[in-house]
Amino acid sequence: MTLLTETLSNIRPVDAGLMAQAQARLDNKTKPIGSLGRLEEFARRTVAISGSLDPSTAKKAIFTFAADHGVVEEGVSAFPKEVTVQMVFNFLKGGAGINVLANHVGADVLVVDMGIDHDFGDTPGLIDRKVARGTRNMAKGPAMTREEAVTALEAGIELACGCKADGVAMAGTGEMGIGNTTAASAIIAAFSGKTVADVTHRGTGINDAALAKKVTIIEQALAVNRPDPKDPIDVLAKVGGLEIAGIAGLVLGCAANRIPVVVDGFISTAGALIACELCPTVKEYIFAAHESVEIGHRFMLERIGAEPILDLHLRLGEGTGAALAMGLIEAGVKILKEMATFAEAGVEKGRDQ
């Protein structure tokens, strides 16, 4: 049995009984029933996912997966692919947006090389899971082989298993890869059947002419590769990315290990979508951090049945939205654990409570 097959077989529905118990506890806190809105949802879902009425949120980790994309040679991005490796060094030095926001919520940032076209050698702090030096140009053929896609998926699963061993209570996804909005748009187009134009946006800020070219290139990639929407690994291999595969694997591994996973924006949700297509139960373990301004993101969220926590017009990636959402999820859990009950506070209940 492969690691992927074993992981899929270990994913079970969350504990609905514990979720109900958590809500009963929340209803007995010193507040009108339901008055803390989605914070209560975050608390009861964390309980159901973790399998504990006293879930920890002490240790949080955000995985920023990085890889290059061969399709960049078609001119689909405003930035050259060299920016991928440059930003990885920025992450490692602590100077990026994700570093600032992760520090803000007390989360660790773990940077993973899934497929960057650069020889890092023994770079301190970088997790080496390189499958290839980037994908191939999907406009001309498959982005990767099926074997490469599975290897990248299993690398993400292994990282999730490491989270379990290290006592990580909440994981987050992030990414870096010039050209990866092209891959994400291709993935949602393949699964949804929507036109490429309906799911493709400006990514790093391309102009109208470049956007039109990006749409054409994605249409070409789909026509050349004909990814099978009934086979998620086929979609991933033909029009995906190595960092997207790593994210998908992390999400699967978190579900198998009962770890809440906070999924960032458009590219991260492409990975989560692959995971959910492989095993629909996975969606029970996902918190959607935010809704990106990338127009294809809404269709992804709808397909996995996830309601985003935030809408801040974010489009950076890296895991920035996941970091912010983690703070709110943790706040909900603290309400469950730290807020007084009516009896403890000596406060009378309302007539309907």
Curated annotation (Swiss-Prot):
Pathway: Nucleoside biosynthesis; alpha-ribazole biosynthesis; alpha-ribazole from 5,6-dimethylbenzimidazole: step 1/2. Gene3D superfamilies: 1.10.1610.10, 3.40.50.10210. InterPro entries: Nict_dMeBzImd_PRibTrfase, Nict_dMeBzImd_PRibTrfase_bact, Nict_dMeBzImd_PRibTrfase_N, Nict_dMeBzImd_PRibTrfase_sf. The keyword Transcription does not apply. Keywords: Cobalamin biosynthesis, Glycosyltransferase, Transferase. Its EC number is 2.4.2.21. The active site is at E318. CDD domains: DMB-PRT_CobT. GO terms for biological process: cobalamin biosynthetic process. One of its GO terms (molecular function) is nicotinate-nucleotide-dimethylbenzimidazole phosphoribosyltransferase activity. It catalyses: 5,6-dimethylbenzimidazole + nicotinate beta-D-ribonucleotide = alpha-ribazole 5'-phosphate + nicotinate + H(+). Catalyzes the synthesis of alpha-ribazole-5'-phosphate from nicotinate mononucleotide (NAMN) and 5,6-dimethylbenzimidazole (DMB). Belongs to the CobT family. HAMAP family: CobT. PANTHER family: NICOTINATE-NUCLEOTIDE--DIMETHYLBENZIMIDAZOLE PHOSPHORIBOSYLTRANSFERASE. This is Nicotinate-nucleotide--dimethylbenzimidazole phosphoribosyltransferase. It comes from Geobacter metallireducens (strain ATCC 53774 / DSM 7210 / GS-15). The lineage of its organism: Bacteria, Pseudomonadati, Thermodesulfobacteriota, Desulfuromonadia, Geobacterales. The gene is cobT.
